[in-house]
Amino acid sequence: MMLRKFHGLIFLLVCAIHAHSDLAFSAEYRIGGVNPEALLCRPEGKGPFPAVVHNHGVGVDTVGYQKAVKRGYDLPGICKELAAGGFLTFVPIRQGGPGLRNLPPHKAQVLEAIDYMKRLADVDQSRIALTGNSRGGLLTLMVGVERSDLKALVIMAPAEIGRNFSNALSQISSLNAPVLLLVEKGDEPEFQNNFDALDRVLRENKKEFKSIRYDQGGGHSLFHTAGYYLQDIKVFLHDKLGGK
């Protein structure tokens, strides 16, 4: 009888650990390599540097880092381009796959990434920006309306997952950071509508922001590349974060 109870206790502990692991994310990262947990790109010179945490879209969650890069998802190029602009750039590769149920742990991973950056000696803790596209854009907004320590947000073609985008819009009054909002004209109606809704709510709440709807092609995939839009991001970040 005691042995049966002991086995039952072990089973419950294993289940509890497994359930908790869905939300847990290590603050230590395997940087770079074939199967990285994150990318980290440093500018030339000595810090402390202004910093960027970049949140990728759902394509990486769906097929994994290696396949996404082979399909044109140029996270290394984005990371290097932002670093060339003078920003120490960190790109966490989210764990857990796509879907609504993984959004809370993905949000927790963004928070962990910000805290990780604040511990780096060559990061200026007072000058950290959060950027992201699609699912990463939604996560950027969700975190941005809750934290007061972010210097700027860049939100590209944000997605609606469940009602999380709508819920974040209802919290815009608490937003402190200036926002750069981007979308490409050829993107799908969902992302155009989300762009318009966020633009409207930012305007109604008299928040500091700039919105750009590009008309140069690329659609939703534009923000998977290290493309022309990064120049606007670098100008915005230099204005809000300053140089080294």
Model-derived segments and their meaning:
Residues 74, 100-121:
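Alpha/beta-hydrolase active-site loop
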Residues 47-49, 58-98:
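Short substrate-entry loop that stabilizes the transition state in hydrolases
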Residues 55-57, 183:
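The conserved beta1-alpha1 loop
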Residues 206-244:
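C-terminal catalytic histidine-bearing segment of alpha/beta-hydrolase fold enzymes
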Residues 152, 157-210:
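The feature captures the conserved acid-bearing segment of alpha/beta-hydrolase catalytic domains
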Residues 22-47:
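N-terminal cap/lid segment of alpha/beta-hydrolase-fold proteins
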Residues 112-174:
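Primarily recognizes the serine-hydrolase "nucleophile elbow" in alpha/beta-hydrolase
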Residues 55, 156, 214-215:
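Alpha/beta-hydrolase
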